[in-house]
A protein has these predicted regions:
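Helix-loop boundary and gating motifs at the non-cytosolic
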Residues: 2-61, 220, 224-267
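Helix-to-loop junctions at the C-terminal end of transmembrane segments
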Residues: 63-76, 165, 277-291, 375
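C-terminal ends and interior cores of transmembrane alpha-helices
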Residues: 85-101, 301-313
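Cytoplasmic helix-loop-helix junction between adjacent transmembrane helices
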Residues: 112-152
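Intracellular juxtamembrane helix-capping segments at the cytosolic ends
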Residues: 119-134, 251, 331-344
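Transmembrane alpha-helix termini and helix-breaking/packing motifs in multi-pass membrane transporters
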Residues: 156-179, 366-382
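C-terminal transmembrane helical hairpin of 12-TM major facilitator-type secondary transporters
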Residues: 293-334
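A late C-terminal transmembrane helix in Major Facilitator Superfamily
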Residues: 347-378
Length: 417
């Protein structure tokens, strides 16, 4: 296993931009919980906290694909350096505004500005890997490594944010402050590594013969969301996000009903640990199946596992089921990202990855909302019914999208079909 990852990490600059990217993606998993904890504490309202948090989320969903398109055209550092700086300053402003009990409209505006300019760091890192690596099996290993690092951020980030916001001797805005520090340290370190930055693909290059040919080739590519495979993957990721969001709510409800509310974090952490381990194993070898089969196998595995949660008699059994089901998460997401990589043109890669990442994040919000309503009405069992429904919904969408997924562009394919 170690050999596969050692092979890609020996490339000049790989370890450096991977480390920077890991730090820079922590804020994505921390801002939401930091906002809810801080605003609720300072304003005494979960509604207000939800409003400010939603502003950040909606703006991020809108802004990430736009920033990604600009990155593909003009380059990562040229676009994201000012965006990261303004996003960080907006988070500082949000912390100050909340501390002085400013009007909620000001908080929402600052939260939206911070989210809209945050970008999708995972997409930027994966784009660097794609530009650096030439062998399909190396790209597969790199994307699996990134899936594992995503899990690290999303397992540890909320725990760190909660600890900072709830520790008695620290101000409740400490979660935001930590987000700013990690965004600046990781973001500036990452964007400062110009040697590994992918070359931009301007839409109007200088009209040399070579540039004219590049322009004609770029014009031949349809918009990202006109690819059938892209639409299928985006919808699948949207539903998977809903599954993840619903699972968060259902796990908290189950642990609360069992009289151990604090154990909900352990259940969710175990779910992430399973995904982390599977990501490393999945990326350590080349799989004989085409990508669409790998995706469908992962979706079915998730659906079967998620269908068992509602029958768990105890937290211990639920944790075991979550660990086993988590094994399907990272391989499923990685195969989906790999399909994006072989579907869109190189000049559209960052945008394509940002679209599916955005779909996943939107789904989390939708799943949390719907599962929250189901849980209020029928307890954790109803919440886990929603989890299972989302899981099988993703399978159905995957099956319906198979014609497009099987026709995905095969130049540089990872699956050899």
């Amino acid at each position: 296993m170690a050999t596969s990852y050692r092979t890609i990490l020996i490339h000049p600059g790989a370890r450096s931009f991977t480390s920077a990217g890991l730090i820079a993606r922590f804020p994505m998993s921390m801002v939401g919980i930091s906002t809810i904890l801080a605003v609720e504490e300072l304003y005494g309202s979960y509604t207000a906290a939800g409003l400010v948090s939603a502003a950040n989320f909606v703006a991020m969903a809108i802004g990430a694909p736009i920033l990604a398109r600009c990155v593909d055209r003009y380059g990562q550092s040229r676009v994201m350096l000012p965006a990261v700086l303004v996003s960080s300053l907006s988070l500082v402003g949000l912390a100050v505004a909340a501390a002085v009990h400013a009007h909620l409209g000001i908080l929402a505006a600052l939260s939206a500005l911070a989210g809209g300019l945050a970008g999708s760091m995972g997409s930027l890192v994966r784009a660097r890997w794609t530009a650096m690596l030439t062998r399909p099996e190396e790209v597969h290993a790199a994307f699996s490594l990134e899936a594992a690092l995503d899990e690290v951020a999303f397992i540890l980030g909320p725990v760190l944010a909660t600890a900072l916001c709830t520790t008695p001797f620290l101000p409740v805005i400490s979660g935001w402050v930590c987000c700013v520090v990690m965004q600046l340290v990781g973001g500036l370190w990452f964007l400062g590594q110009r040697a590994t930055e992918p070359a931009p693909h301007p839409t109007r290059p200088r009209r040399t013969a070579e540039a004219a040919e590049q322009s004609d080739q770029a014009a031949a590519h349809p918009p990202v969301m006109r690819y059938g495979a892209m639409v299928s993957i985006a919808i699948v990721f949207l539903i998977l996000g809903a599954l993840f969001g619903a699972n968060d709510v259902a796990a908290v409800a189950f642990a609360t009903e069992a009289g151990h509310k604090s154990a909900s974090g352990l259940v969710l952490a175990v779910w992430g640990v399973g995904s982390f381990g599977a990501a490393l194993l999945y990326g350590s070898r080349t799989w004989g199946w085409p990508l669409w089969k790998q995706l469908m196998a992962g979706l079915v595995g998730l659906a079967v596992g998620a269908s068992t949660f509602g029958f768990a008699p105890s937290l211990v059994v639920l944790s075991v089921l979550a660990l086993l089901t988590g094994l399907a998460i990272a391989p499923t997401l990685t195969s989906g990202n790999n399909i994006v990589q072989v579907t869109v043109a190189p000049s559209q890669l960052t945008e394509g990855l940002a679209w599916v990442s955005t779909a996943l994040n939107i789904g989390v919000s939708i799943g949390s909302l719907l599962a929250g309503q189901a849980t209020d009405a029928g307890g954790s069992r109803a919440g886990y019914l929603a989890v299972a429904a989302f899981a099988w919904g993703a399978v159905v969408v995957g099956v319906l999208g198979l014609p497009a997924l099987r026709r995905a562009r095969t130049s540089g394919s990872l699956d050899g079909h």
